[in-house]
């Protein structure tokens, strides 16, 4: 469902949805599939787009989330043009059972050839 998120770019993200979550807080369950859906307005022309997903724990400890797709062009059509409305849909699949039970901010960044394309984070936690 639609999440309330904090923008860490320049308001490029128009809507962010996470499967089985809504509102201000997302509880992610191990062993359950997860889908992210982000709608954003492109702030640059770029042929390549990187995706960086980071868990921020205790306010300032940032951990890259391993095993995830880093080439956002596999999740949406590239190249993209400045001013275009874009949608990225990422079916992450099942959250591994080895994922620790933690509370964290999950920060997602899209990086284009000319810097940050979009950036947003949500509050959440991983549970059994």
UniProtKB/Swiss-Prot annotation:
Keyword Secreted tagged: yes
Keyword rRNA-binding: no
Keywords: Allergen, Secreted
Pfam families in the record: E1_DerP2_DerF2
Listed GO CC annotations: extracellular region
Top-level taxon: Eukaryota
Cellular localisation: Secreted
Protein family according to the UniProt entry: Belongs to the NPC2 family.
Protein's name in the database: Mite group 2 allergen Gly d 2.01
């Amino acid at each position: 469902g639609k999440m309330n998120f904090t923008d860490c770019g320049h308001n490029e993200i128009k809507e962010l949805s996470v499967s089985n979550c809504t509102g201000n807080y997302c509880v992610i369950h191990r062993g359950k599939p997860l889908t992210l859906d982000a709608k954003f307005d492109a702030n640059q022309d770029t042929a390549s787009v990187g995706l960086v997903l980071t868990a921020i724990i205790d306010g300032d400890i940032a951990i890259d989330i391993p095993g995830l797709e880093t080439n956002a062009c596999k999740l949406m059509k590239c190249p993209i043009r400045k001013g275009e409305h874009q949608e990225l849909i990422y079916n992450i699949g099942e959250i591994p059972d080895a994922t620790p039970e933690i509370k964290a901010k999950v920060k997602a960044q899209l990086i284009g050839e000319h810097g940050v394309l979009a950036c947003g984070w949500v509050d959440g936690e991983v549970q059994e």
